[in-house]
């Protein structure tokens, strides 16, 4: 079963819950303490899209999307793989400003996680992610396919490429109506949320590997 067939099933299954949750989410501005950011930090967000509702319904955590950050002369940028974000957007690996990544119509809350590594490793992970910008979004959620990427797969592969498994082997096994996949979801690459400070107004880095 293709990605969008699966999404339509989940939408039907969770429609009432998703709509109620979405209505309850107030539009707030999420701020990031950019002075404390490092290259290679992972930024998680809970989004407002239907796809985000699907992910949080299937996952054990409260975040639906993730990207890897890089500081440039134009400010902080995020490399991330995202589907169907705007009506005219292609479903690809994107490279955009952090302000766009956390703008209120996309983001309910955000959290930044730091991967413990040296500058050489971080540089290698970022280089890998940058090389994938423009490549297609993985609509089949096939972790064995290195020509397409979904968000958690991209950041996982970026660090795996330089020798760090940020998932520590954790996976979600999804088997619903012919959609039978082993996937990496946001909670698989995130520390236990009870050990982290969460806020819908700001995000501060936490070291976990």
Indicate where each model-derived feature is located.
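Cysteine-nucleophile amide-bond enzymes
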Residues: 19-209
